């Protein structure tokens, strides 16, 4: 069982890197901060623009330093198209028909950049020798970087468990580090889940989301592991007795 105690150190650090990956992919996003602190996750809307408008090379969002409302920074938005004259008419027609509908006009669960201007959205085209660019203003939604909160949490847990194991390895009871991992990871996760957007729609009707509900029994399991040195062995025994007939 000492192997499991060591494994949780690597698992904690691995979870930290997974959450960093989620951050860069704009996955498992946090709720709006409703303040001027936060992160605007632009990757999802960049993908949508690429799929809705033709000949897009890349999309850039730049903070203007101004705010539409508290927690909603105004972004200078540039869409760079392929620079070929024969494509221009199709690009202009697509922008005229679709641009004001690509961005949502209000905050929803997964909206990160919105267009509160709707029909009054002002945009302009600019051509240089190297590129053909569409420029307009959009409004970002400041959100909690919940992935980074969780990554930092797991990293601290991993380092803490390693230090404890390195200093007290000869005196640690089997299951003690495993229990400590469950206690810290799932107690902190319970609170971090509270600032994440729900992952599936049915969670909207729940008082606690699924991440919080799953954290409760795992926290209790960690409590059991931590205070009972023979806990893992007992769990295995109960598991065996449940699925297999003793007489057989």
Task: Give short role names for the model-derived ranges.
Residues 1-248:
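A feature for loop-to-transmembrane-helix boundaries and adjacent hydrophobic helices
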């Amino acid at each position: 069982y000492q192997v499991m105690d060591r494994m949780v150190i690597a698992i904690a650090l691995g979870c930290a890197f997974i959450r960093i990956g989620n951050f860069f992919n704009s996955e498992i996003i946090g709720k709006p901060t409703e303040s001027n602190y936060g992160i605007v996750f632009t990757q999802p809307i960049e993908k949508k623009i690429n799929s809705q408008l033709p000949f897009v090379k890349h999309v850039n969002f730049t903070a203007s330093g101004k705010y539409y409302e508290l927690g909603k920074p105004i972004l200078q938005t540039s869409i760079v198209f392929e620079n070929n004259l024969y494509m221009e008419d199709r690009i202009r027609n697509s922008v005229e028909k679709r641009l004001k509908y690509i961005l949502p006009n209000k905050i929803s669960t997964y909206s990160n950049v919105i267009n509160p201007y709707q029909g009054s959205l002002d945009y302009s085209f600019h051509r240089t020798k190297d590129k053909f660019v569409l420029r307009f203003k959009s409004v970002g939604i400041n959100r909690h970087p919940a992935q980074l909160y969780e990554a930092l949490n797991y990293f601290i847990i991993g380092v803490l468990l390693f230090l404890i194991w390195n200093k007290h390895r000869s005196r640690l009871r089997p299951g003690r580090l495993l229990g400590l991992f469950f206690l810290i990871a799932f107690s902190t996760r319970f609170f971090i889940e509270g600032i994440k957007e729900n992952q599936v729609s049915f969670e909207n009707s729940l008082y606690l989301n699924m991440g919080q509900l799953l954290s409760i029994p795992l926290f209790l399991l960690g409590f059991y592991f931590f205070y009972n040195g023979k806990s893992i062995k007992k769990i295995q025994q109960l598991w065996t007795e449940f699925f297999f007939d003793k007489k057989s």
